[in-house]
């Protein structure tokens, strides 16, 4: 969905000698247009993403006329690329990372590799279920199914020590992809790889600890004296979990065009209202006294 997440993979493939193309889906990354449509139906947002993908595929295949072409998608995009590749027989392979899709068929699309992180047990189980649904008996990770001559290879495997996001930054993922292309093309492209994931992690940790350090230079305020019973705290949490879904199922305000963002905004507003009316009136003064606006502004900007 977002070009920034796919950068390590794209760089690794480019270093191996392949032309790579990254793009942002509607409503993702730097794409100027929002996505729209019902996210719970195939005919809604999914179909619009598929149409967008098909347009990009057609453009670049026509522009470069490659002898080999492959599409890669992660998470939500894994379903999109499987559907799109099934409609584009000129694609030689599709790679679904952290896959969750029901669109895969026995011979469509061509040559499919499914990769999940080791720490994604549900998606790993789902991927084996996908193979079962297309007629593979007792499927195993790391084993090839189908015939290369028929362009119907199917393989599910996992990336060691990786989760839903880490799988995109893992050097092992990069190596798997280069090895997969070499296998399909009977080629021997050299794998170089990159450690963008490690440097990204160092950057985030540095920003995190630097932020903690900078808060020490902000004005301090003494904490108020609160009297908040455990039972009240317990019931507020129960109400905040149960009530918002019941309200938002029947009534929501439209603040933005993004369905997921709009839902989160409504959810936060409802929870804030619940918390506001759950506080004892005598505590509002203490909350106001201890509110640290500079700290709030600093965290908000971050």
Q: PLM ranges: what are they?
A:
Residues 188-202:
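Juxtamembrane/start-of-transmembrane alpha-helix segments at the extracytoplasmic/lumenal side
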Residues 153, 232-234, 248:
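Contiguous hydrophobic segments
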Residues 181-191, 214-217, 243-253:
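Membrane-embedded alpha-helical segments in integral membrane proteins
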Residues 74, 79, 222-228, 254-259:
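Short juxtamembrane and helix-loop transition motifs at transmembrane-helix boundaries
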Residues 1-192:
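Soluble extramembrane regions of membrane proteins in the secretory/endomembrane system
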Residues 201-243:
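Juxtamembrane interface at the cytosolic side of transmembrane helices
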Residues 238-302:
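Alpha-helical transmembrane segments of integral membrane proteins
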């Amino acid at each position: 969905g977002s070009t920034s997440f796919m950068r390590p993979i794209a760089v690794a493939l480019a270093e191996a000698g392949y032309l790579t193309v990254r793009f942002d889906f509607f409503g993702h990354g730097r794409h100027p247009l929002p996505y729209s449509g019902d996210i719970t139906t195939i005919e809604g947002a999914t179909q619009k993403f598929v149409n967008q993908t098909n347009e990009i595929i057609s453009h670049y295949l026509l522009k470069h006329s490659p002898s080999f072409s492959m599409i890669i998608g992660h998470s939500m995009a894994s379903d999109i690329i499987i559907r799109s590749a099934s409609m584009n027989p000129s694609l030689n392979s599709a790679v679904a990372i952290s896959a969750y899709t029901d669109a895969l068929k026995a011979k469509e699309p061509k040559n499919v590799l499914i990769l999940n992180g080791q720490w994604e047990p549900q998606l790993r189980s789902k991927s084996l279920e996908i193979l079962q649904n297309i007629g593979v008996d007792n499927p195993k990770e790391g084993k090839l199914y189908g015939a290369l001559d028929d362009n119907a290879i199917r393989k599910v495997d996992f990336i060691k020590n990786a989760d839903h996001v880490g799988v995109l930054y893992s050097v092992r993922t990069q190596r798997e992809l280069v090895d997969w292309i070499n296998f399909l093309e009977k080629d021997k492209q050299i794998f170089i790889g990159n450690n963008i994931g490690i440097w990204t992690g160092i950057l985030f940790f540095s920003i995190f600890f630097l932020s903690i350090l900078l808060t020490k230079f902000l004005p301090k305020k003494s904490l108020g004296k609160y009297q908040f019973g455990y039972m009240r705290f317990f019931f507020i949490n129960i109400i905040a979990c149960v009530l918002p879904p019941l309200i938002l199922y029947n009534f929501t305000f439209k603040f933005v065009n993004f369905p997921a963002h709009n839902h989160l905004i409504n959810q936060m507003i409802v929870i804030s209202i619940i918390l506001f009316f759950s506080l004892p009136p005598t505590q509002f003064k203490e909350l106001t006294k201890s509110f640290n606006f500079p700290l709030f502004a600093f965290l908000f900007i971050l």
